[in-house]
Amino acid sequence: MAKEKFEEAMAKLEALVRKMETGDMTLEESLKAFEEGIRLSRLCASRLDDAERRVEMLIAENSNVTVQPLRENGEKNES
């Protein structure tokens, strides 16, 4: 089974949230949707963690560059 891509998982998660927000699901459907949402959320977080590690490894290969954490808006943290 091929790995699910981040973009695919995020699109599924967004669609699932929209469906749940309508309030038209039964309790059982809502529980199944919630479980799937948790799975997709964890998958997306894992893919983002993997991408962050890859970027840090690439930066570490260049000894003149230091790794700086990013703020939530994506800008460098200059502290």
Curated annotation (Swiss-Prot):
One of its GO terms (cellular component) is exodeoxyribonuclease VII complex. One of its GO terms (molecular function) is exodeoxyribonuclease VII activity. It catalyses: Exonucleolytic cleavage in either 5'- to 3'- or 3'- to 5'-direction to yield nucleoside 5'-phosphates. GO terms for biological process: DNA catabolic process. InterPro entries: Exonuc_VII_S, Exonuc_VII_ssu_sf. It is an enzyme of class 3 (hydrolase). It is found in: Cytoplasm. Pfam families: Exonuc_VII_S (PF02609). It comes from the Bacteria. Its main location: cytoplasm. Its EC number is 3.1.11.6. SUPFAM superfamilies: XseB-like (SSF116842). Keywords: Cytoplasm, Exonuclease, Hydrolase, Nuclease. Heterooligomer composed of large and small subunits. Bidirectionally degrades single-stranded DNA into large acid-insoluble oligonucleotides, which are then degraded further into small acid-soluble oligonucleotides. Belongs to the XseB family. This is Exodeoxyribonuclease 7 small subunit. The lineage of its organism: Bacteria, Pseudomonadati, Thermodesulfobacteriota, Syntrophia, Syntrophales.
